[in-house]
Regions:
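Expand to "…catalyze enediolate/carbanion chemistry for C-C bond making/breaking, isomerization
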Residues: 3-300
């Protein structure tokens, strides 16, 4: 039973989401440039980055870009307009048909908000996932219930994106370098995501010229358990990739743990000795993920 449990975790599909770059869907040059960037994820934005009168044209442009491909190993995500807007349903239809990997749904404050989009996706390919923006006070209060939709039959939710800018605005918080007002929002979202085995990405860092501050915030997000960070400028990609990649010594240790548990004398054990330390099955499970992420990055 022990060996089987470890093996199951090892075979789960894991995609690196260290860097997720927003790019305006109305900018044809940006859609083309995305094919050359080292971001794990490109998010083509039809919401905040597009004026109302340009929504339809931007939608068609993004759908054509996705359909034509050329983005390689990058995960291609489109941020649609909020479900209660007149553009959202057409966004979903066009981008699902084009073959986006995922749709990022803004202003998800309760499970029913995702349910609307899932209903529109009825009959669409099961591989199309949903990402949810957690960016309102009500979303923070409901974050566990929103995450639970991932476990429902046919649930498409696979990732949370924290919208720190909107949360700061709506809570009237005064943010400091340590992000003290945000600690509850961030931790609650990570906890809910982990409870239902979905990924979670940290919010953007607004001053893209402040690399030191950006690196500090990446380190903070990783410490809290984030899988990656959303970005507003290509200059932030390398730092995000570095911050959210497993360290070489951590990968070496993880491989050693897995090899130790595979030894015949350790089969079926929940705890073993390695290098003078007690290593538990939970460490083996953590090691599986570390190795899987490292291998996925190396194979990108």
């Amino acid at each position: 039973m022990v060996r089987r449990a470890i093996y199951w975790r090892c075979t789960m599909e894991i995609r690196p989401r260290r860097s997720a770059l927003y790019m305006p869907g109305s900018n044809a040059r940006a859609l083309e440039k995305a094919k050359t960037l080292d971001a794990d994820v490109v998010i083509f934005d039809l919401e905040d980055a597009v004026a109302p009168e340009a929504k339809a044209d931007a939608r068609a442009q993004v759908a054509d870009a996705v359909r034509n491909g050329g983005y390689g190993r990058r995960e291609v995500v489109a941020r649609i307009n909020a479900p209660d807007t007149p553009w959202a349903k057409d966004d979903v239809a066009a981008l699902a048909e084009a073959g986006c990997d995922a749709l990022l749904v803004p202003k998800v404050s309760k499970p029913e908000d995702l349910g609307i989009v899932e209903g529109w996706l009825s009959g669409a390919a099961g591989t199309i996932r949903l990402w949810a923006m957690i960016e309102t006070p009500l979303a923070i209060l409901n974050v566990a219930a929103i995450a639970a939709t991932a476990a429902q039959p046919g649930g498409r939710l696979s990732c949370f994106v924290i919208g720190t800018n909107d949360l700061v605005k709506d809570t009237r918080a005064e943010m400091d370098a340590a992000r003290t007002p945000a600690l509850y929002w961030l931790s609650a979202t990570v906890t809910a995501a982990r409870a239902y085995d979905i990924d979670v990405l940290d919010g953007v860092y607004n001053n893209f010229k402040d690399l030191e501050g950006f690196e500090r915030e990446c380190a903070h997000g990783r410490m809290l358990g984030m899988d990656g960070k959303t970005l507003i400028h290509p200059t932030q990609i390398d730092a995000a990739n570095a911050a959210f990649s497993p360290a070489a010594d951590a990968v070496d240790w993880a491989r050693k743990v897995l090899a130790a548990f595979e030894q015949p004398e350790n089969q079926g054990k929940g705890v073993i000795k390695m290098d003078g330390q007690m290593v538990e099955l939970l460490h083996a499970e953590m090691a599986k993920r570390t190795v899987a992420i490292a291998d996925a990055i190396a194979g990108a």
